[in-house]
Structures are given as structure tokens and as C-alpha cells.
Amino acid sequence: MSVDVAIIDYGIGNLFSVRRSFEYCGARVIISDDPKVLLSAPRLVLPGVGAFADGMRGLTERELDKVVIEFADSAKPLLGICLGMQMLVSTSEEFGDHDGLGIIPGRVIPIPKTMVTGKSHKIPHIGWSGLLLPDDLPGWQGSILEGLIPGDAVYLVHSFAVQPDDDTYRLANCDYNGRVISAAIRKGNVYGMQFHPEKSGLVGLNIIRGFLGT
């Protein structure tokens, strides 16, 4: 059976809710941990929830870390969701220092426990936030966010955030009590989303359709 997108099964992640969202958008989807199946797919999704170290362990124990890196090098579209986005970068400070996949230079750092005013706020960051254009980005044309309007809201659940080494990797930000957080990142054919498109209503479905259109 030909497929439109493969979802990586590495023992962690909201695989089936992601699958349902892609199928709702008309995609033929396969969930697999078979390297041959994953590498032959036209698009690849790396989902994930939970701790960074557990996610990387799930990938490396199955040797799927190599698969993700090889796929990224193939120029075919790759999407990391939530923990999947975080694992795309170089390192994480979550419960120690851990190596990531290193596909997009950057690190995962804790969300500051205070607002910019110094007042404490709730961690994890849970809820809806509007997507914001980074200062040096004129628009989302030519990306999977094309067609969205700044302020369109997406759903996030996280205590850690990606800090790209270069701000040009930022595709969208969100604001949490004055703290600017990377909501989406991009390096060529590789995208990462800190939010959950499968839980983000019509906005999320439009992003999924954008990914399927690449």
C-alpha cells in the first residue's frame, strides 16, 4: 500500500491521535518502527510526549535515531511534534544534560519560572497561545504555516522549550506571560512544532494539510 506519511513508533507518543488527525485530512498513514518502511515514505512524523531522555532512549534502542537523521538528509519533509521537535535539536537540559539528534542546532531549556515582571507563573505551560511571527520573518509563505494569520491559536503542554542557536530557525513564536517561546522551528525540509496540531482544532488541521502539501 502506498502511503502519504509514516509515523515513527518508538514506544512513546500519542501515535493514534496524530494518525487520526492526518487521516481526517485525507492522508494514507502508516505507523511503523521498520527503518525500510520509514525511509521509503514520502513524509515522516516524529511525535512524542514525556521526558527527553526517555524519548531519545526509545529511538536509540531501536536504532531509529539514525533513520530520522538519514530521512532529514534526504530532503523529504520531516515533522517533529512536541517532544519530537525537542529531540530534533542538539542537546537538552531536562533532568540532566542529554544529546539530541542534532538536526537543527539548538538546545532545550526550562521555561523560566517567573514572568518578565518577576512574578511566578504556572509551569508547565498548558493551554492555548497565539502564533507570532518572529521579528526577522516577513511571513509564513512557502512553509507549512502558509495561510495562517498571526494570532491563530494552538494548544501547548510543556515545561521545556527549544532555544535555537540561530534565530533564523524560528518559524513561529508564542508569548507566555512575556516570555518568548519557540512554537515552531524550521531548517529546510525539517519542521518542529512545540504545540500539538492534532489538538489545535481547525488551525492544527490546516497545518497538517500544509505538511501534506509539501
Locate each region found by the language model.
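Acyltransferase
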Residues: 2, 190-214
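Structural signature of beta-strand start/N-cap positions in the alpha/beta core
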Residues: 28, 43, 77-79
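Pocket-forming structural segment of enzyme catalytic cores
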Residues: 93-175
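Beta-strand-turn-beta hairpins that frame and shape the catalytic cleft
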Residues: 151, 186-190
